[in-house]
Swiss-Prot record:
Domain of life: Eukaryota
Lineage: Eukaryota, Metazoa, Chordata, Craniata, Vertebrata
Known role: Directly regulates filament dynamics and has been implicated in a number of complex developmental and morphological processes, including mRNA localization and the establishment of cell polarity.
Molecular function terms from GO: actin binding; adenylate cyclase binding
Protein name according to UniProt: Adenylyl cyclase-associated protein 1
Keywords: Acetylation, Actin-binding, Cell membrane, Isopeptide bond, Membrane, Methylation, Phosphoprotein, Ubl conjugation
Residues modified to Phosphotyrosine: Y31
C-CAP/cofactor C-like domain ranges (all copies): 313-453
Subunit structure comment from the entry: Homodimer. Binds actin monomers.
One of the GO BP terms on file: cell morphogenesis
Organism: Macaca fascicularis
Annotated compartments: Cell membrane
Membrane topology: Peripheral membrane protein
Biased composition regions of type Pro residues, renumbered to the chain: 229-242, 300-312
Length: 475
């Protein structure tokens, strides 16, 4: 009975796909996709079925949700259309050399970057989990360059999306079914693509054995919906007419120049002889009299390429992050922010603060541990930590505990101020390879007394072992 039910479900899915191909052609073309021609290769026709099925459903639901999700979906659709164009090209042409192949793949690569950039530019979006699911998996479009296992690569990207789609399901499961359907439609694109690859491109994109070597993408959709740019601007105005008077002057100058050249060797008769006392290298006194030499304009020369053996690449600014990933709070690449707050904390959670500059962060509640890594001018205020607060590879860091913390570890850090509360006076301060460390103890009046952590030590051999003691700097 169960087998019969499964068979019925499979038949229903097959019928639904056929209906999508036959009855949604208008909608399909409305999104800018050209329908398969009768002579198209089987794997191009199969890809069109994917576009007409799960992709069309994903676009439809994204349009219903609207906003950033709809905009993102349109970018994804453009990438899929570019991929279709590559498939058409591969079905008609032979595979080019690697350097030419990269040119064919460039439009798809650029579209992938655009999808990812859109997520980074809209971190404040209410639909950020939707954008993240797409951004983390859109690189699946790169399967065309993956050999010999493009299918597993797509599955890996699909799994990356599920981390965020699970968040969408958790948030909207009992609120809005439309978002649940969106998750199913989007993930089905990649599962269907895996099946498609397994059937037609198991070990990599299949190219034609005949025809010309591919030079450019074929089968790109036409019209404004194809994602192409605006038409080129009209040509500029023609150049102004040439002045006849200036032309005659130039002609006269040119004639005079040729007349001088035609003199041949006799032209040197007008040159003046230079005696030794007029030469600066024979008469040093001339150098002192002449003063600084003014150089005339340099003749034009084509710019020469830089010959530096190791040019430094431009520094790429990483996006700022403040999010909960599993049980880890990630606070990364924050700059010049003074009001960061994490208040939805649990005992099993940890906080990892990385590459933050001139930033203040407050962590409320009780968490397991905090790590500060590679930060500069960071101010950290926290309530309670049951494990350890670790500061490593940082400069000019100030931490203040409002409740209790058992251990503060300072490693490879220059400049650290630790403000303790009355409940954390028994805190252990463990330091290594660090300098300018101070512990501040609260007073009855509400102020703090500052005590430096020793940095200079004296070690002696007592006959049996090394004995190390703290030394004070004299003077």
């Amino acid at each position: 009975m169960a087998d019969m039910q499964n068979l019925v479900e499979r038949l229903e899915r097959a019928v639904g796909r056929l209906e999508a191909v036959s009855h949604t052609s208008d909608m399909h073309r409305g999104y800018g996709d050209s329908p398969s021609k009768a002579g198209a290769a089987p794997y191009v026709q199969a890809f069109d079925s994917l576009l007409a099925g799960p992709v069309a459903e994903y676009l439809k639901i994204s349009k219903e949700i609207g906003g950033d999700v709809q905009k993102h979906a349109e970018m994804v659709h453009t990438g899929l259309k570019l991929e279709r164009a590559l498939l058409v090209t591969a079905s008609q042409c032979q595979q080019p050399a690697d350097n030419k192949l990269s040119d064919l793949l460039a439009p798809i690569s650029e579209q992938i970057k655009e999808v990812i950039t859109f997520r980074e530019k809209n971190r404040g979006s209410k639909l950020f989990n939707h954008l993240s699911a797409v951004s983390e998996s859109i690189q699946a479009l790169g399967w065309v360059a993956m050999a010999p296992k493009p299918g597993p690569y797509v599955k890996e990207m699909n799994d990356a999306a599920m981390f965020y789609t699970n968040r969408v399901l958790k948030e909207y499961k009992d609120v809005d079914k439309k978002h649940v359907d969106w998750v199913k439609a989007y993930l089905s694109i990649w599962t269907e693509l895996q099946a498609y690859i397994k059937e037609f491109h198991t070990t990599g994109l299949v190219w034609s054995k005949t025809g010309p070597v591919a030079k450019e993408l074929s089968g790109l959709p036409s019209g404004p919906s194809a994602g192409s740019g605006p038409p080129p601007p009209p040509p500029g105005p023609p150049p102004p007419p040439v002045s006849t008077s200036s032309g005659s002057d130039e002609s006269a100058s040119r004639s005079a120049l040729f007349a001088q050249i035609n003199q041949g060797e006799s032209i040197t008769h007008a040159l003046k002889h230079v005696s030794d006392d007029m030469k600066t290298h024979k008469n040093p006194a001339l150098k002192a009299q002449s003063g600084p030499v003014r150089s005339g304009p340099k003749p034009f020369s084509a710019p020469k390429p830089q010959t530096s053996p190791s040019p430094k690449p431009a520094t790429k600014k990483e996006p700022a992050v403040l999010e909960l990933e599993g049980k880890k709070w990630r606070v990364e690449n924050q700059e010049n922010v003074s009001n960061l707050v994490i208040d939805d904390t649990e005992l099993k959670q940890v906080a990892y603060i990385y590459k933050c500059v001139n930033t203040t962060l407050q962590i409320k509640g009780k968490i397991n541990s905090i790590t500060v890594d590679n930060c500069k001018k960071l101010g950290l205020v926290f309530d309670d930590v049951v494990g350890i607060v670790e500061i490593i590879n940082s400069r000019d860091v100030k931490v203040q505990v409002m409740g209790k913390v058992p251990t503060i570890s300072i490693n490879k850090t220059d400049g650290c101020h630790a403000y303790l509360s009355k409940n954390s006076l028994d805190c252990e301060i463990v330091s290594a390879k660090s300098s300018e460390m101070n512990v501040l103890i609260p007073t009855e009046g509400g102020d703090f007394n500052e005590f430096p952590v020793p940095e200079q030590f004296k070690t002696l051999w007592n006959g049996q072992k090394l004995v190390t003691t703290v030394t004070e700097i004299a003077g």
